Amino acid sequence: MALRVLDLEPAVKHYTDVLGLLETGRDKQGRVYLKAWDEHDHHSVVLREADAAGMDYMGWRVDSIQTLKDLSKKVEESGLATDCCWIPAGEHLETGERFRFTTTTGHTMELLAEKNKVGNCLPLVNPDPWPDDLKGMGPSRFDHCLLYGDDLDGVVKLFTEVLGFDITEQVVAEDNHDFRISVFLSCSTKPHDVAFIRQPMKGAFHHASFILDNWGEVLRAADIISKKKVSLDLGPTRHGITRGETIYFFDPSGNRNEVFAGGYIHYPDKPIITWTSDDLGRAIFYHDRKLNENFLGVFT
């Protein structure tokens, strides 16, 4: 995931000292590369200084160069993506060739097959359960993004029929269960790797989420938010959708972050969980059971 920030160094301080990511490099364009401690790849987050906050792109690593070639062809031929192009190897640090495209919701996505591994701060033989000297909330990995866009049907078709994602959960209209309001998609065993909400706009970014181990770590994250005087959005609380335990807060540029624990293991044959719009408050905030307009209405 690549994010735009308004002032680079305060953003880096937030993502390293508050969230607890590790800086792994900087390139000639001034971009900063970060990873969570238990990720082996060189980076999972890229920060770039810009005039407007938001998401540049979300990237997906596939299992081989052949898969990358096959999927890029399918995306180009699907009619569900525009602006398809190849980014040469080395344009990002420690990263191979990338295939870039824009979804019907206006979000830029990338596929890649090669990224150098730097390890997870632990040995591969007889390791300890976690490394010393972690900072901040100390998430173990980047988890997912929630994105806003207008053509929900098109992006869901692209992700399911072309890219092979599963729908894990969905929100539908109370009086028309064929009309989807939101869809949660997984290409793994997680409750979601990306989610989309139908909104009358293109390319909007709601939040990026990072995984913690348990509810106690979510509460500790709340303490860190208060100690560091970070802008709190809401939480700690629980989602009905995904069952996740959560707290939301903002980076200095206004990009929303989440740290998240719990959830469930998703298998490809698991039936889709459906929520109806009349119960949306409980679906999003299981304890309060009320919609929060600031949570839904603030995005970058």
What are these regions (language model features)?
Residues 39-45, 106-109, 118, 191-194, ...:
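Short, charged/polar, Gly/Pro-enriched secondary-structure boundary elements
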Residues 1, 15, 21, 34, ...:
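Short, structured motif recognition centered on aromatic/hydrophobic residues
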Residues 1-6, 50-138, 141-150, 183-185, 229-300, ...:
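Vicinal oxygen chelate
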Residues 2-41, 147-191:
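Core segments of cupin and vicinal oxygen chelate
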Residues 1-9, 55-58, 117, 122-153, ...:
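N-terminal beta-strand motif that seeds the catalytic metal site of vicinal oxygen chelate
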Residues 1-100:
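An N-terminus-focused feature that recognizes amino-terminal "leader" regions
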Residues 153-246, 251-253, 257, 268-269:
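Structured core of small recognition/catalytic domains
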